Swiss-Prot record:
A motif (Nudix box) lies at residues 43-64. Residues 6-149 form the Nudix hydrolase domain. GO terms for molecular function: bis(5'-adenosyl)-pentaphosphatase activity; guanosine-3',5'-bis(diphosphate) 3'-diphosphatase activity. NCBIfam families: PRK00714.1-3, PRK00714.1-5. This is RNA pyrophosphohydrolase. It is an enzyme of class 3 (hydrolase). Its cofactor is a divalent metal cation. It holds the Pfam family NUDIX. The gene is rppH. The keyword Chaperone does not apply. Keywords: Hydrolase. Accelerates the degradation of transcripts by removing pyrophosphate from the 5'-end of triphosphorylated RNA, leading to a more labile monophosphorylated state that can stimulate subsequent ribonuclease cleavage. Its EC number is 3.6.1.-.
């Protein structure tokens, strides 16, 4: 008998800099708890919370700023398994099912990774599309490419 896998409902933000559309750069941040892991901000959806509400809350918690404009939403939930090395950190879940949003930082937005007592990220940067997939952690690359390519195809990027 095989156990059914358990996936954590989650939101993720593809963040464009406030310079978009003049300059197309993506926000990525370096996690504090996983060596060399760069990724987009993301986090769980609390019970009774909409994905959009979770997006704003998670941005505030993880980057100290939710002063963004939502440009688009990926039409599907994307499910993936955690790599074996990360599974203990997120017990009892085997992976995540994520709703992705494309957002642009507003001009007056101020990122503050130290806004909360236990920071999720230790540093961040903005990268161009062709640099993005070299920078982010290996197990997120396929999903990120799928999501971003969708937003490009839809004319949102």
């Amino acid at each position: 008998m095989q156990n059914k896998k358990s996936y954590r409902p989650n939101v993720a933000a593809v963040i464009l800099s406030s310079k978009y559309p003049e300059k197309c750069e993506f926000f990525v941040a370096h996690r504090t708890d996983i060596r060399n892991a760069w990724q987009f901000p993301q986090g769980g959806i609390d019970e009774g919370e909409t994905p959009e509400d979770a997006l704003y809350r998670e941005l505030l918690e993880e980057i100290g700023c939710n002063n963004v404009e939502i440009l688009g939403e990926f039409p599907e939930w994307i499910t993936y398994d955690f790599p074996k090395t990360a599974r203990g950190k997120v017990y009892p879940f085997d992976g995540q099912t994520q709703k992705y949003f494309l957002v642009r930082l507003k001009e007056e937005a101020q990122i503050n990774l130290q806004a909360f007592e236990i920071p999720e990220f230790k540093e961040y940067t903005f990268v161009k599309y062709d640099e993005l997939f070299q920078k982010v952690t290996y197990f997120k690359r396929k999903v990120y490419r799928r999501v971003i390519d969708h937003f490009i195809k839809e004319g949102l990027i």
